[in-house]
């Protein structure tokens, strides 16, 4: 019998459900139905962010699900993220309060620094003049206060390289519980995964299918012949194999879909596994990062190159 891998334990002792519904690029008007369908299918983990612009709609649906007795608040694991315009320590609690208000919650289970980048307060877009020097230790102190208050049951980071995570661990009183990064068979993050594991930081993978629904990212992750071959042998879809690979590598996965049939398919990853001989073939897959963060790279930015933004993990 395959090991189900329904949860991973965080360094706080809390359990994070291994499959969460991603809501990035989920259009308002569709995201509510997606969350409703996902929870009824069995998802207990919803990945949100203020910058996605859909937390209000998600909040309305969550309230309806809680009020209707479909699921209890304590059975759900809700993540949100601090956007780059709120890195000033005084802005951090305000940002979370706004998210809590929109989601109609008293607390989030996980609150992440979305990017290791500071943008001018109130700015939209990524004009070079909006990119400020970063002070992650100060922002993290404010995050620790949210953890102390109970409004964020766990805190963590997103899009942090091994080096940036190592630097934060040196100064952190409360170590990050999670580093959420792009991760899929065509961007496996082996160096970062090993580092996170060695420090007790859980790796969570966004775009685990390579963002097939986006128009501005060219993604052939699911068309990879190795993935296709394994899927065929196991009688599964390439998407299911990509997700199950993530679970077997020890990371939670956050597939995004607004189609009920795919939301259901993406959850069918528990009662089977990829045999070791097939798993080893994944090391032959060519690697390439899709979400590169070019918007944050400029000669006047703290990051003059992608090399600097990712500290060589590119």
Curated annotation (Swiss-Prot):
Keywords on record: Acetylation, NADP, Oxidoreductase, Phosphoprotein
EC identifiers of the protein: 1.1.1.-
Chain positions found as Phosphoserine: 295
N-acetylalanine carried by residues: 2
Top-level division of the source organism's lineage: Eukaryota
CDD domains in the record: AKR_AKR4C1-15 (cd19125)
Binding annotation for NADP(+): 23-24, 47, 114, 158-159, 180, 207-213, 256-258, 262-266
Protein name: Aldo-keto reductase family 4 member C10
Organism: Arabidopsis thaliana (Mouse-ear cress)
């Amino acid at each position: 019998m395959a090991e189900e891998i329904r949860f991973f334990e965080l360094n706080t002792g809390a359990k994070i459900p291994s499959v969460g519904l991603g809501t990035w690029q989920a259009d308002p008007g569709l995201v509510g139905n997606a969350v409703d369908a996902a929870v009824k299918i069995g998802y207990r983990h919803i990945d949100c962010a203020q910058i996605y612009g859909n937390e209000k709609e998600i909040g309305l649906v969550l309230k309806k699900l809680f009020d209707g007795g479909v699921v209890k608040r304590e059975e759900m694991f809700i993540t949100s993220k601090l956007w780059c315009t709120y890195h000033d320590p005084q802005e951090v609690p305000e940002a979370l309060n706004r998210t809590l208000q929109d989601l109609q919650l008293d607390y989030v289970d996980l609150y992440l620094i979305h990017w290791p980048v500071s943008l001018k307060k109130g700015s939209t877009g990524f004009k070079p003049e909006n990119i400020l020097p970063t002070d992650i230790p100060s922002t993290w102190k404010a995050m620790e206060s949210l953890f102390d208050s109970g409004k964020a049951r766990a805190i963590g980071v997103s899009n942090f390289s091994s080096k940036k995570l190592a630097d934060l661990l040196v100064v952190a009183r409360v170590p990050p519980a999670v580093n959420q990064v792009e991760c899929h068979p065509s961007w496996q993050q082996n160096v970062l995964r090993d580092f996170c594991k060695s420090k007790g930081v859980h790796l969570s993978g966004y775009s685990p299918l390579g963002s097939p629904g986006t128009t501005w990212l060219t993604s052939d992750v699911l068309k990879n012949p190795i993935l296709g071959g394994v899927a065929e042998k196991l009688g599964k879809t390439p998407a299911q194999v990509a997700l199950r690979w993530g679970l077997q590598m020890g990371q939670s996965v956050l597939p995004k879909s607004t189609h009920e049939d795919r939301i259901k398919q993406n959850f069918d990853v528990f009662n089977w596994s990829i045999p070791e001989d097939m798993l080893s073939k994944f090391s032959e897959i060519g690697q390439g990062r899709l979400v590169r963060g070019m918007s944050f790279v400029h000669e006047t930015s703290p990051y003059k190159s992608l090399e600097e933004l990712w500290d060589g993990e590119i």
